[in-house]
Design a protein with these regions (language model features):
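Bacterial Sec-dependent signal peptides at the C-terminal "C-region" and cleavage site
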Residues: 8-24
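Positively charged n-region of N-terminal signal peptides that target proteins for export
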Residues: 1-4
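Hydrophobic alpha-helical context, especially transmembrane and signal-peptide helices
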Residues: 6-8, 99
Length: 156
């Protein structure tokens, strides 16, 4: 019983600290249906909700087709079949997103890389995005790599 009281007190204190920190977060949950394109649907949702600084909190679901790009490769790799979404992580913004996906096949073989257009939902994709009203995520070249990298700015 003491453990539960201690845990409840900790949760209340943490909630109060977050509330007083000036950081406001929102949680957005949505479901994709069979045949929808995972990346296009996420990009569309981010645009519709005008999310300027967000991240994927969780995603579970499955795909029939996938299109991913492995590290340091110019072209994507694709395949058809039935695949579980093991993980989907990354940052999202109306200014550009950066998402990585891991999928597994029917034997449990798992692979992952940059999420590209062409990942079609098999049964479902249940997605939660958390966003911050405090920051804005931008993408720009910074000289350290040839790619547009994340720039975190205070929200105006």
């Amino acid at each position: 019983m003491r453990r539960l009281s201690w845990l409840a007190a900790l949760i209340v204190l943490f909630s109060a600290a977050c509330k007083n920190s000036g950081t406001m977060t929102q949680h957005h949950a949505f479901r994709l249906k069979p045949g929808e394109d995972l990346k296009l649907a996420i990009d569309s949702f981010v645009k519709e909700k005008q999310i300027r600084a967000g991240w994927i909190s969780t995603c579970v679901g499955s795909l029939t087709d996938y299109q991913i790009r492995f590290a340091n490769q110019e072209k994507g790799y694709s395949d058809k079949g039935h695949f579980e979404i093991v993980s989907l992580v990354g940052t999202v913004s109306i200014n550009g997103s950066h998402l990585h996906i891991s999928i597994s096949d029917s034997t449990g073989k798992t692979m992952g890389g940059h999420l590209l257009e062409g990942c079609k939902i098999y049964t479902t994709a249940e997605i939660v995005i958390t966003s911050s009203d405090t920051f804005e995520f931008l993408r720009a070249k910074d000289g350290s790599t040839p790619w547009n990298e994340l720039q975190v700015q205070p929200r105006k």
